[in-house]
């Protein structure tokens, strides 16, 4: 394969034991990364490459949203927004190929373990018990009768 783009002409292996589909154009991530401007904007969503340059002015969230995800894997951002089935259907018209199998990240466990998602709510492990203790203290003082000294 020469360059960053390859077209699979027959079903088979890519030389690394990974199956490639027939008549699919494969792009390397480095090729996609070059397409990150208003003149040419490509996105990767679930291993598929989309040229959304024509869609920039039509995107309901504005062109800035697309520019932020240009040239990279935008799968997580795409899913986080919760696009409608109409938006997913519309996306098909911008499909130009797939990411080369050797550039694909594994679907299961694809998150970087150094970026622990549970730590986003670490504050809850400290703040909520403190608030609960303070609340219990106030309730205890409010509902217990004051002791009278003789």
Swiss-Prot record:
Transmembrane segments: 122-144
Molecular function per GO: heme binding; metal ion binding; nitrite reductase (NO-forming) activity
Subunit note: Component of a complex composed of cytochrome b5, NADH-cytochrome b5 reductase (CYB5R3) and MTARC2.
InterPro entries on file: Cyt_B5-like_heme/steroid-bd (IPR001199), Cyt_B5-like_heme/steroid_sf (IPR036400), Cyt_B5_heme-BS (IPR018506), Cytochrome_b5 (IPR050668)
Propeptide span(s): 1-15
Name of the gene encoding the protein in the UniProt record: CYB5B
Modified sites of kind N6-methyllysine: 39
Keywords: Acetylation, Electron transport, Heme, Iron, Membrane, Metal-binding, Methylation, Mitochondrion, Mitochondrion outer membrane, Phosphoprotein, Transmembrane, Transmembrane helix, Transport
Protein name according to UniProt: Cytochrome b5 type B
Main location: mitochondrion
Region feature (Disordered): 1-21
Organism: Pongo abelii
């Amino acid at each position: 394969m020469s360059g960053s783009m390859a077209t699979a002409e027959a079903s088979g292996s890519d030389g690394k034991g990974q199956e490639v589909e027939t008549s699919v154009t494969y792009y390397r991530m480095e090729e996609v990364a070059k397409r990150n401007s208003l003149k040419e904007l490509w996105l990767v969503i679930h291993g598929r490459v989309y040229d959304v340059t024509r869609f920039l002015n039509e995107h309901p969230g504005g062109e800035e949203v697309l520019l932020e995800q240009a040239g990279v894997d935008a799968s997580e951002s795409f899913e986080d927004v919760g696009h409608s089935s109409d938006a997913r259907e519309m996306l098909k018209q911008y499909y130009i190929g797939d990411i080369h199998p050797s550039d694909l990240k594994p679907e299961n466990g694809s998150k970087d373990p150094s970026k622990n998602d549970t730590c986003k709510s670490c504050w809850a492990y400290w703040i909520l018990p403190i608030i609960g203790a303070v609340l219990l203290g106030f309730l205890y003082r409010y509902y217990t009768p004051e002791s009278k000294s003789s």
